């Protein structure tokens, strides 16, 4: 699905097909070692979460995407302390957490949000707000403050 190895099979655009949890797991695994920058539509933002985000940054967002480059960036830095399945929680975290703030950092001139929660320790997802094409949140990076009691 992600890497169309058979050119005779017409590939559906990434923004049409929302990945299942199993497809997301495969996408993350392939992205960690791949060299291309593939994109994946991984979930929708529920209305309550969309309202919280709009109240914080003033922008409407509806969907969540991952780019393999952001996955590689998040996992290649040892200081990020990520577990193998951390990115599989991203949609649930965005839709349920109330700890959202505008980041001091921008990505490609777009505003970013820091979305923090506790999944066996504090984890932060830095999401770029892309208002084009109906409004998307895209992962920039992800990190844990500690892992297994260790501190940075």
Task: For every predicted segment, state its role.
Residues 1-152:
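Ribonuclease/tRNase effector modules and their secretory precursors
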